[in-house]
């Protein structure tokens, strides 16, 4: 298993897919990393040479990933809450932040529906 940015990449997958296991790296970023490192997208993680691994590591180190990225996202949310913005209030209340309607849906954000006693009459 190749270990990049503190994440063990699955050996049997292609490197372009394996890189997406790192938080903060999606499909397009993974392709850019491999292009800059000069590594083929079709090569499997187990077939990487140590030199190729090091080139990929150098490219990944230039991007904010994993713990640093998670910390920045949580700090951004905390900042929104502290300044009392609408988005911060929605985060604090556990409701959708991006303007979605909540009359019928938003179960993922709001949690499981709670029945109200004697509601039906």
Curated annotation (Swiss-Prot):
For biological process, the GO terms are:
translation
Output a single Gene Ontology CC term carried by this record.
cytosol
Which residue ranges run through the membrane?
none
Top-rank taxon of the source lineage equals Bacteria
Q: Where is this region: Disordered?
A: 88-121
Kindly indicate whether the keyword Ribonucleoprotein belongs to this entry.
Answer: yes
InterPro entries per UniProt: Rbsml_uS13_C, Ribosomal_uS13, Ribosomal_uS13-like_H2TH, Ribosomal_uS13_bac-type, Ribosomal_uS13_CS
- Keyword annotations: Ribonucleoprotein, Ribosomal protein, RNA-binding, rRNA-binding, tRNA-binding
What one GO molecular function would you report for this record? tRNA binding
Using the record for this protein, list the coiled-coil segments as residue ranges, or answer none.
Answer: none
Quaternary state and partners of this protein?
Part of the 30S ribosomal subunit. Forms a loose heterodimer with protein S19. Forms two bridges to the 50S subunit in the 70S ribosome.
What is this protein called in UniProt? Small ribosomal subunit protein uS13
